[in-house]
Amino acid sequence: MQTQLLNYQFMIKSFGKILSALPITLNIAIVTMIFSLILSFFVALARINKIKVVSKLATVYVSFIRGTPLLVQIYLSYYGIPKVLNHMNARFGWALNVNNVPIIVFVYVAFILNMSAYMSETFRAAILSVEKVQMEAAISVGMTKWQAMKRIVLPQAFVIALPNFGNSFIGLIKDTSLAFVVSIVELMGKAKI
């Protein structure tokens, strides 16, 4: 009697059930990517322009986030934010109900803060890779520093950073499986892998 290595009927039957969790996975990844792009851009600018206090805070933020595992950050978000909000309620007399906050919000916070730290380094490296003479040339023809940055430097930096953003998005899709630890059932959680 010959045994079958893979049960293809079971795989086909299960595929539809697993795909039902795909919107949650994509939702986490896309929302995280959008907000991370925005936050990481400002973190990168703060570090490049060496704004006194803000630059130091951005450096500490990037170092801390990149030095701790995402799983720890999810737990800190999931257990820490409610504690902070309860403390703020008691301290300032607010009436915020922490129990009404959906769990996915804590996942978004952890993922956005994590991805922003990594993507800020991508932004920073991409901006610094554009030669300074291009900024100087733009300023010499009458552009302000912000105009030169917006019209000359950032478009080139974005092209340089785009492959890294793609890699970050792929990694983010994989990382969404960690949301299962706080009971968000996404693609891998649904598959029980």
State what each model feature region is.
Residues 1-193:
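Transmembrane alpha-helices and adjacent helix-loop boundaries
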